Amino acid sequence: MIKTITYITTAFKEGYVPPGALDWSDADDNNAFHAKQIVIDLDATLSTELAMYHDQEKYDDAVTLGLPNDNAGRPIPSLLGISGAFIPKGAKNPEAAKDFVRYVIQPNVAGEYLKAGLGRWLPAISDIVKNDPWWLDPKDPHRLAYVTQGVLGNTVPYHTVYNPGWAEANAAQIWGQAHANVIRNNMTPQVAAEGALKRIGDILAKYPITQA
């Protein structure tokens, strides 16, 4: 953790990261890429690329790649988030809502729905991409790389599936605050790491999980 915080904050201090990055909102990494403030955007969808979809020259000029290998030369599994539907308990017509969800999650329907979004989000069912050549069409190298990484490649779920406390810790932006403490408050990476880990530990302690 100390090495990671040191690496990230040093890159900022040496001018490799836009000064405004400490105050970015959710879409500002995309905006910075399009404004040519950064050359790499680590994004979970194809939103950055698809913003250039109707500008063929810009679309073709960008490159989508998977994660690099780790220090031992082994592939790094990709963190994969899953979005789901929910039906509020107070819904006026829950049975109709359930019927709609059952309809949407059919592989052929889900596939067409996601294709209408130009593949910005990945199918949760691998057979969708295996049975429809559109998903792996080499004519669109962005989508091909994205699907290969997120559907056909090695993935692991976000930590929230193991303990709900991770959602609270993530919402608190603990690691971002640790980086900001080093950059703005001259805190050492070691002190920042210790504080972040303690805060995460305090949050997770509120969600004990009994081992079976």
Where would I find each of the regions flagged by the language model?
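Regular secondary-structure segments
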Residues: 9, 172-184
